[in-house]
Regions:
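Conserved AMP-binding/adenylate-forming
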Residues: 15, 46-51, 55-72, 79-174, ...
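AMP-binding/adenylate-forming
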Residues: 1-31, 47, 72
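AMP-binding/adenylate-forming catalytic core of the ANL superfamily
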Residues: 22, 133, 138-139, 157, ...
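Conserved helix-loop-beta element of the AMP-binding
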Residues: 20-24, 37-58
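Short hydrophobic/charged patches on amphipathic alpha-helices used for structural packing
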Residues: 7-11, 39, 197
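Short acidic/polar active-site loop segments enriched in Thr and Asp
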Residues: 20, 46, 69, 207, ...
């Protein structure tokens, strides 16, 4: 999806080559919704796999409604040979979950502190997602990168630390709860940015939303969000904040600020690059602090 113009022609390419399935990140599916399908025959397309980042529920439902194609959410990392879990093609599909572990892929959720596995989590308890099995790589080429990447359980089994937070439900399905490093910690209260992003994506004018923590002298950090709007939209940032305030389930998670930006910073594979958004928030807070103190400086 890095080729310029590919997205604009993707419907045609899928129809021409009679594609049975495709795999992409959520931002690709969100963008496809704004590209007319025209007369392309997509009856060949049976399944669309999605991973790499949480799929906003509104985008999920709208894509299936518009295309009639079933979306299957899954999970994987390069270190785990791309896919480790997936919602079943035939069987119960749980929207919002990353499905069931694939055959031979071992996934576990555990409490990890200082690169030490404290204990495995109970059903429904959130912890760090660990993986092992023949699909998991043995280690990085540069041994220094292995520091903190592995934990060992009481039986001497070695697990790769994904850095993602997750939980198992009663049926054995996995549910992501964000990246450990993406959690917004407001005065000791952990806030999952996904709960903010999903509510903002319910607004008809919002294409993409990303929530991050901005520095705060009192609480350490507070939630804010960046959004990309549909072409021609005139909705204001304050109107979006009011919209979120009425829908975000936790009062502490309501974003204190929303900024409208022309496009999201992306990684090479199409994932929203949150470190850049956090940098933008830090730069703005620093500028405002310096200006309030009457200090002339450039950030």
């Amino acid at each position: 999806f890095r080729t310029p113009g590919l997205l604009q022609n993707l419907w045609g390419l899928l129809a021409r080559h009679r594609a049975y399935a495709m795999m992409a990140v959520p931002t690709v599916y969100a963008s496809l919704l704004d590209i007319p399908r025209g007369e392309h025959d997509l009856s060949c397309l049976r399944h669309c796999l999605v991973g790499a980042a949480p799929m906003p529920l509104e985008v999920f439902n709208r894509f299936e409604r518009v295309t009639g194609v079933k979306l299957l959410e899954g999970y994987g990392m390069t270190e785990g040979t791309a896919v480790s879990s997936l919602n079943p093609v035939a069987g119960q599909r749980k929207v919002g979950s990353i499905g069931l572990p694939l055959p031979y892929a071992e996934l576990a959720v555990a409490l990890v502190e200082d690169a030490t596995l404290q204990r495995f989590c109970e059903t429904g308890e959130i912890g760090v997602l660990l993986m092992r099995g023949p699909n998991v790589f043995p280690g990085y080429m540069d041994p220094s990168h292995d520091s903190g990447a592995w934990v060992v359980d009481a039986n001497g089994r070695r697990w790769f630390n994904s850095g993602d937070l997750a939980r198992f439900d009663d049926d054995g399905y996995l549910w992501l709860a964000g990246r450990a490093k993406d959690l917004i910690i407001r005065g000791g209260h952990n806030i999952d940015p996904q709960m903010i992003e999903e509510r903002l994506c319910e607004h008809p004018d919002v294409v993409l939303a990303a929530a991050v923590g901005q520095p705060d002298a009192h609480a350490g950090e507070v939630p804010m969000a960046y959004v990309v709007l549909r072409d021609g939209s005139t909705v204001s940032a304050e109107a979006l904040r009011e919209f979120a305030a009425g829908r975000v389930p936790e009062r502490a998670a309501v974003p204190v600020r929303i900024e409208i930006i022309p496009q999201m910073p992306m990684t090479a594979v199409g994932k929203i690059f949150k470190p850049r958004l956090r940098d933008l928030a830090i730069e703005r807070v620093c500028r405002e602090t310096l200006q309030a103190a009457g200090i002339e400086a450039t950030i």
